[in-house]
Amino acid sequence: MRFTLNGAAVDVAVHPMARLLDVLRLDLGLTGTKEGCGEGECGACTVLIDGEPVCSCLVPVAQVEGTAVLSIEGLGDNHPLQHLFMNEVGAQCGICTPGMILAALSVGPTPTLDDIKTALAGNLCRCTGYSAIYRAVMKWREVEHAEGERSSQVSE
């Protein structure tokens, strides 16, 4: 199977029905994507496939051939949303955090609280509740929006 993973082309020789989650964790050694329920109910295994959040425990690797997959490792260690999750105490045990962060990337540039709740509806957290997570995503988008306005003013 060939696909792009975190910006790099990968070619893995695995059974086409192997779960993408297992290929990431076991075959490629990317353990940031977590298995929670294994049934697509909790969102811990969320990755982005062509920019859309998907539970990787439900996806046979054959379905990602020719696509672009982003796992939490693809963000690196310095993504602003990761820092805001820590600052707002939106992460505790860490099982849901990678999936929450990747699902949050699908939130539009000026979201309402309802937009954020909708984007994260497929992700469960047993530790923090959701207020800190929603706050982190809202602050991230506010900062991104403000920086975008500043850079457009500079270029005018």
PLM segments and residue spans:
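Signature of N-terminal electron-transfer/Fe-S-associated modules in redox systems
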Residues: 1-156
